[in-house]
């Protein structure tokens, strides 16, 4: 499936820890920052953007259409539209696919697409329209309810990871080893400055002065198997999934500027890469973490590629269990997967992660001179999404 859509520029904020650096920063402010960054990196004026599409899973309490808020805060004129979409963890990558489709149909020539999320600012709420005459009432944690709980079986995403671990016979040791490797790779990448080009600094204003956030704060330096082994199972007393071999609760944003090949050629712009294909596929919600398996196969088929053609892969690490299952089933070379660590180390701001891994993939492909790459994520509710990228 060939399209005329190419990625001209990409950027992300650092990923913040839960109640960390971005604890009081609304998602649309993070989104505005990455929109501004990709416009600057591409040399495109805000007034030239046709539309902004941003994934977000937890918009409750942020006001009408946070994507529109982000766009206008970034200087995109009111004549250009903006909207948000929600495909849970796949939102950021699906937003890019939607932007690609807008360009492919001729409805737009320049799109900014990506994702943003503040898990820290997701509110607790209660339905009080009917009134509470007396006694206590229940508050709902919207982050847990809307972002992390399976709507069909009523259990946490961590339980779906336990299901995958059992089905794929993945031991605690295997999951912990995967998680430690992710942390160690991310630590090495951070110390080596490999994330600096993709991260745009964000200034957090405070009473004691401004703080510039320009480095991922969730990465655990010095992670070891011994420290990982001390953690208790988080979702099943007899289980294998822990806080250490699962991704975190995080805040962040990422975006890409998409343009038609004709428009890029007219402007004389050298793109980061071309979107060759994409796919999204449904699976059993009980094992939602396996979604990248059929989604990746379908995206590769549409691209006319084979797994062996891939130079780099960014496969989101919602849980070590599902990441190990994906790696085993697809059989790709593990040395090309998440070479700078994944979400277990960097973090998983759910609505932004799809754009974050695409961003990381594009910059690492450029750094290595890699030709073909694939980005993929599992999605709550039983889905997967994948995208094939080719350098130009």
From Swiss-Prot:
PROSITE patterns: THIOLASE_1, THIOLASE_2, THIOLASE_3
Organism: Shinella zoogloeoides
CDD domains: thiolase
Gene that encodes it: phaA
Source organism, top-level taxon: Bacteria
Protein family according to the UniProt entry: Belongs to the thiolase-like superfamily. Thiolase family.
SUPFAM superfamilies associated with the record: Thiolase-like (SSF53901)
Pfam families linked: Thiolase_C, Thiolase_N
Location(s) in or outside the cell: Cytoplasm
Protein name: Acetyl-CoA acetyltransferase
Result for mutant: residue 378 to G: Loss of activity
